[in-house]
Swiss-Prot record:
Record flagged with keyword Nucleotide-binding: yes
Catalyzed reaction equations: NAD(+) + H2O = ADP-D-ribose + nicotinamide + H(+)
Annotated ranges, domain NB-ARC: 241-511
Protein name according to UniProt: Disease resistance-like protein DSC2
Family: Belongs to the disease resistance NB-LRR family.
Keyword ATP-binding applies: yes
Coiled coil: none
Organism: Arabidopsis thaliana
EC number: 3.2.2.6
Organism lineage: Eukaryota, Viridiplantae, Streptophyta, Embryophyta, Tracheophyta
Source superkingdom: Eukaryota
Gene3D superfamilies in the record: Helical domain of apoptotic protease-activating factors, P-loop containing nucleotide triphosphate hydrolases, Ribonuclease Inhibitor, Toll/interleukin-1 receptor homology (TIR) domain
One Gene Ontology term of the molecular function aspect: ATP binding
Enzyme class of the recorded protein, top EC level: hydrolase
Amino acid sequence: MAIAEVIGFFTLVCVIWYWVYKKHKNLQLKICRSSIESSSSSSSLSSPPSLSSPISRTWTHQVFPSFRGEDVRKGFLSHIQKEFKSKGIVPFIDDEMKRGESIGPGLFQAIRESKIAIVLLSKNYASSSWCLNELVEIMNCREEIGQTVMTVFYQVDPSDVRKQTGDFGKAFKKTCVGKTQEVKQRWSRALMDVANILGQDSRKWDKEADMIVKVAKDVSDVLSYTPSRDFDDYVGIRPHITRINSLLCLESSDVRMIGILGPPGIGKTTIARVLYDQISEKFQFSAFIENIRLSYWKGWHDEGNLDFPVEIMTGDRQRKLNLQRRLLSELFNQKDIQVRHLGAVQERLRDHKVLVILDGVDQLEQLTALAKETQWFGYGSRIIITTQDQRLLRAHEINHVYKVDLPATDEALQIFCLYAFGQKFPYDGFKKLAREFTALAGELPLGLRVLGSYLRGMSLEEWKNALPRLRTSLDGEIEKTLRFAYNVLSDKDKSLFLHIACLFNGCQVNHVKQWLANSSLDVNHGFEVLSNKSLISTDMGLVRMHSLLQQLGVDIVRKQSIGEPEKRQFLVDVNEISDVITDNTGTGTILGIMLHVSKIEDVLVIEETVFDRMTNLQFLILDECLRDKLNLPLGLNCLPRKIRLLRWDYCPLSIWPSKFSAKFLVELIMRANKFEKLWEGIQPLKNLKRMELGDARNLKEIPDLSNATNLESLLLSFCTSLLEIPSSIRGTTNLKELDLGGCASLVKLSSCICNATSLEELNLSACSNLVELPCALPGDSNMRSLSKLLLNGSSRLKTFPEISTNIQELNLSGTAIEEVPSSIRLWSRLDKLDMSRCKNLKMFPPVPDGISVLNLSETEIEDIPPWVENLSQLRHFVMIRCKKLDNISLSRISKMEGVHCLQITRGDEDVSGDSIVNIRWYSNFPNQWTLQSDMLQICLPELVYTSPVSLHFISNEFKTIPDCIKNLSQLHQLSFYRCHKLVSLPQLSDCLSSLDAENCVSLETIDGSFHNPDIRLNFLNCNNLNQEARELIQKSVCKHALLPSGEVPAYFIHRAIGDSVTIHLKERHLPLYLIFKASLVLFNDDEINYDYDDDDDDDYDEEVIVYGDYDSYPHSDDYTKQETMRLSCRVEGKQNGLTIQYGSSVHLLPTPHRYTEHVYIFEASFSLGECNSPEAESELVFDFKVHDYFWAIKECGLRLLELPHAHGDD
């Protein structure tokens, strides 16, 4: 009895273990699809692009060859097998298998268990259905499991394979006789895909033997690249490794040093470890020297944590000897190596091929001690240095540097989830919080790891409670890592770091330098130091500091005086600032205040003396300002005399403080203020660079600017009460930008503006009362730098004088200009010219040949100027609503093939009585033209008829589309918007991949049929379609179709009422790969979905990680924003009492009109993973769901295209 119980218990444990193992393995296949990036330089192999780190696979076979025996078996194949054998490569041999029409499970398994598939494409390859079915499975494996596919085109043209033409095509067509359309399309698609993989073409080799050697070498190289399973769970690691491998150039015998650069915590060490594990076996000796900075300062035998090198523990020479001893000991695995002089590394390693990774280098002396010169190492050696200091790499003349960037948002979420949940996706209910914590870590891998590990095992409520605290303080481990980088800075560089962290993160670099100029900081040098040490970046001219580094800086300042914020240098917390202001406890310690006004809960009452004691305040930034959040009942006594930056939008003051000095003022930004004027008298403004007072509706005058000799920007847009610009502006000799747009009270521009010899941009747009410009405006000696002049909307301006020939952009849209100066042809730098809505303009003189943008819309021009077709640089040409255009001049348009964007119409589509057509076509570059339909025949260039084209019709008038459309041989997309009178569609191009006839309510007939298997058809709300048209759409071989109908088409064998259908399979294993077509009848039922919950969408979104066909359906077009609904499909397999989810997809559909039933037909595919036990009855369950308040599924139908021997499919 006891023995029976033991046996029973053991059996139960085995069953449970097997169930958990299969469940886990299929869950991995569903969620964790991996990124397979080919690192080989050979063009003859290919693996598909994919997601993050792969699941480890054990390959049973090294190579699976697919070939047509009669072509290659006794000649080419035997030679290549001999070459494989010489290199130790063992291919799968199928000599024992009998070939027929179908492939048995054994061969399917052999294909799936082979690391490489090599397809030998010969003249008669396509004459064998066996070969074609092999190829389909190989291409599926390439897509699903990352199998590497290599091609050899043996005495056959790759183009014939791709297009199924020539002798190859004839053989293919014979094989297709009697086969279903689905099978033929599957074969054709596989041939096209495999032909797109660059491979070896035997016709291009003089000696076949040389090609065979090359193929065998490529196979050997792929087999040699075997990543360690230790790193399979690292998200996004492969792209890093691939790019670094390209820098390493391992096939070269040169000695090369490589730098891996990035800020602390970004994953440099992790990447280096993965790399070391993958390539170390290629070297005689290898060593990974971790955390060199600690070894250097504390000695090899004492590598405890060190926050800061407070004192020199050992002499410089001894520290270097210690480093060399550590390197040699780890390379040769000998702990007792003695190093007595600094030439030991060179002596011991110059004849050896070594791999050395020096991790965490932060001093040049460390490099000179361990790898001073490449001559120290033997041929083929590689030295890899990880550091956050770019200056160090430059100083050591290391030119091959890989900069590690932050992971993408989705990858960052996966990294966080690995540590928080032990898997790459969140638990149910945790998704929103997981995203918040990922954002809190700033997507920095160190932060993601620490926060995820901290939260692991906590309940949802504990997560919610932890979030507020972690938002305001750093975790200890994160702070310790980042703090080291801060501590080694000089005092001045530390100060700059804190300025940026608290005030200037995200600001323009040149602005920050101007704000801090003439201070105690060495700003230029400091920026270089912080940038070199990866503590900031200055890409795109903006200073960027990672959010965790920024939080470090804020924490450092907070600890300057815990509990007494008024004693700190910078104030950034809204509550602490509110307390200091409310209690009026400001001190001279405060240098800067950054207040996000929108975060103030109640109205903040400010006393008039609030700044009296802040004598050293230099930066006052009131951001995200809202009206009525700040109350200054008595105004302000003063502004700090050392103020450099004053940014205060919606300032409630109406009177400027009486005590004010602008001696240090660099930037004044006070948009939408209530002042009528600012300070009285003349202020010392030599440091002032920018003044922005836009939208100050009460402002009547600006202060005296005679001392503002360094002023660069004066922005006064929409100061609607401003009457004039003072004569003191003549002193602003460095003024580059003057914006007076929308100053409606401005009648005349002072001639003093002509002294602004540095002025580059002048905006006088929407100055509705501006009558004239100063007569002294022209001339190379006056305003010679002017490159941009905007006068659009200044409707009373009739003339303007000759202007500088340096002008690059001129906008006169909406002015009363009657003619353009004839000298315009001499403006050699003119690039953009807008004369639209110039109602008085009837003629136009020639413009310079270099112009790229020309807009003549809504003018009285009758003829397209003849010189237009000669503008070789013209890229944008617009003449919409030009009612007097004649057709004769339109013929010139057909010669303007170089114009990317062209728009020509006589009137609005609503009133023209003709349709507007948007044409997108591609030749050497993308083009987008908009014409009226009657212009197509006249205006279309010949190139359009042979180029890929998309057409979008906009109209309410026309009943049929123009005849010339039939001649567009490569028409890919066709859509209609507001085409309510369209009655019929003609036979269209076989290339058509998307037809959108949404809301064509009069459409009745469709001539011809659709031949592209990937086409997407949208006939939403086309309720007038006749029965013949409906049947044509439903029976078309298409990817997606949507049309009015209340029933599932008859050819869908498996049917069910509701939103789920089950297919019972015969007694055999589930298929490896499933392709099916589904049909769903959608209907409106208010009662069903009124309790629809948005959270349900979020849950389903989890299932789209594997298969996300979000773009699966063509929405109308660019002219309408159609509401969409989400429809999801989930496939489950049931066998032996187990339920395994294989995948899900999400489709976005335009929403039909209420109470109109529609049928949605779509094709989808899923990989079902590895085979299950073949003995038990199996079934597949297809669940569909509409994520919408008003819509549900009335009936569903299914048809299997890859037949897994389902009941009813025979």
